[in-house]
């Protein structure tokens, strides 16, 4: 497991399956401290799905085993044995609308108040929550960067496009 971040100006945590690596993620204190320092330096971070789960307080597996995660985003990710929200949504971000999709097998409890919810194309119910803490943006949505490249550039800190 990596113990440090490379020299970068922004981070994208695109997901994966943190539930398969809970003990290793919890034990990697060097990387956890590096991510905390990156966030404290107010650099842009986009965390999607599993990346968002990694940044929450805890992740609980189906058998009830709970692992400490980063604690940068309040809340707990809890595995469930069936799929959650699925389908295309648009993320209405301050930087601009960006299309994406959701597919996950967790739910989040005790999370922060979202800045927005994804908009579903064919369903009136609110989509996935989108949370923000300074320059950290987190959501279950997997964003399609090609949908709005200028908005993505602004999300990652570009000042001119």
Which functions belong to the PLM regions below?
Residues 1, 34-35, 55, 126-128:
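Generic recognition of flexible, low-complexity loop/linker segments
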Residues 1-5, 26-29:
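A general structural motif
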Residues 18-92:
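Cysteine-nucleophile active-site neighborhood
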Residues 77-161:
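Amide-donor transfer/coupling interface in amidating biosynthetic enzymes
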Residues 12-14, 46, 138-140:
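Structural motif
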Residues 7-8, 41-43, 66-68, 97, ...:
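Short coil/turn connectors at secondary-structure junctions
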Residues 2, 8-13, 54:
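Helical hairpin unit composed of two closely spaced alpha helices linked by a short loop
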């Amino acid at each position: 497991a990596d113990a440090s971040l490379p020299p970068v100006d922004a981070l994208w945590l695109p997901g994966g399956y943190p539930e398969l690596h809970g003990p290793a993620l919890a034990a990697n204190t060097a990387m956890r401290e590096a991510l905390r320092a990156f966030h404290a330096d107010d650099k842009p971070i986009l965390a999607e799905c599993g990346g968002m789960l990694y940044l929450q307080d805890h992740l609980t597996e189906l058998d009830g085993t709970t692992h400490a995660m980063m604690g940068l985003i309040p809340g707990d990710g809890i595995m469930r044995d069936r799929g959650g929200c699925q389908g295309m949504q648009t993320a209405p971000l301050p930087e601009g609308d960006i299309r994406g999709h959701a597919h996950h097998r967790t739910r989040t409890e005790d999370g922060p108040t979202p800045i927005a919810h994804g908009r579903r194309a064919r369903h009136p119910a609110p989509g996935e929550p989108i949370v923000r803490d300074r320059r950290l943006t987190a959501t279950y949505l997997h964003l399609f960067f090609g949908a709005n490249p200028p908005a993505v550039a602004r999300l990652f800190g570009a000042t001119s496009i």
